[in-house]
Amino acid sequence: MNDLSQKKLIIYIGLGIVLFGAGTLVTYFFLFRGIGAPAEPKEPEPVSENIPGFPEAGPGIGKDPRFGGGNIQPGSDREIPIAAGIRTRLFLVAELASLGTGLSRAEDKIYYFKKDGGELDAFSFPAGTKEPLSTITIVSMVNAFWSPTRDRAIVSYLDGVVTKSFLFKGIGTSSVATLPVGIRSSAWSPTGSSLVYLTEKDGETALATADSSGKNQKTIFRTPIRELALSWPLSEKFALQTNPSGVVPGYIFIFTRASGELTRFLGPTNGLTSLWSPKGEKLLTGSTNAAGKSLSLAIHDSSGKEIFSPDLQTLPEKCSWAREEKVYCAVPRGIPQDAILPDDYRRGELNTNDRLVAIDLKTKIVSGVFNDGGYDMADIVVTKDEKFIFFTDRITGKVWGLEVTQ
């Protein structure tokens, strides 16, 4: 072999050794170095003490960074002890985000629509079994309001930016009836035999009624007042409430069908929100000061006179009447100092961490019922015997049930 060939051979061998060493080093770093090495420490995910796997919420955990922590409004962290002898069992009803909950006639099932797709399901209790009731598809569903007869519901959904509604007419079927486009608010009559709704057009708000099948629609009143919400507490009386804001005075008006008169019932009151009792004999209201803070509750009789003011800071929409003398409310453990109510809550910028309490109007006693987990409770539903309470968590959209014994 000549000298040139020997030099080439030496060079090739040297390059091979270098490449082999580099490959070995790369393999070591990428494949073997991590084996046996301690993992980087991770911050443990907080969970509820009594409900494993569910994150504990703070006083304000909404989208707005103002509510990540800090000071809370005076009096909003009041302790509410659990009543003596009360025992509760929490169970999951719907794992997927849902809305439009309602009880069956026999009060042995809770109905709910899946938010993604709008299918109607039922959860039987206490058995804990589930069954699909309708496969109708509802895209961009907003809400559903069940009739007092518990066999049909007014369903609203978004078509682009336009709100559309229809009447879901039968459990276990896909029978529907179209309602007018642009319904702003709707309600059932106390017996469920009729429905009423509000639409806005040409600078006016129109109040119209229809039968329980959505037929025989008739406009019965018009007003220049805009952005109203509707309730039907008594057969001949309709309650019209102005859009609530903590920084703007609000009103509740009563329209009497027989006389055609519109009269002021409550207001001007900042942060005014409301919830009528089942028979329309009482009204639960929430209000604030002129800055949208210092939230308070009050209960009025049918004339508007205040009859009781429990020392609680919550919104009526987080409450449910079990009967004329009993109200259940979800009460935040604290309200952030910078929160304006009900504005921030209704815009979805604020979530609350709630306890569940009962308000007895006969004894004027407020007692704790449930004080676990990190739930922003809404759409509370209570059985007549008060042994089962259901709520939707606004944070996750899941539906939960609570069995109460004492």
Spans of features found by a protein language model:
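Sequence/structural signature of beta-propeller modules
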Residues: 1-90, 406
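Beta-strand-rich domains and repeat architectures in extracellular enzymes and scaffolds
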Residues: 58-121, 138-144, 377
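Conserved beta-propeller blade repeats
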Residues: 95-104, 137-154, 175-198, 217-241, ...
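Short, solvent-exposed loop/turn segments at conserved positions within beta-propeller repeat blades
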Residues: 113-116, 158-163, 200-204, 244-249, ...
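Short coil turn/linker residues within repeat-based beta-strand modules
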Residues: 117, 126-129, 170-174, 213-216, ...
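Beta-propeller blade signature
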Residues: 167-171, 210-212, 253-258, 297-302, ...
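Short, conserved, GDST-rich strand-edge loop motifs in beta-rich repeat architectures
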Residues: 330-351, 401
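Blade-level signature of beta-propeller repeat domains, shared across WD40, Kelch, NHL, RCC1
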Residues: 380-406
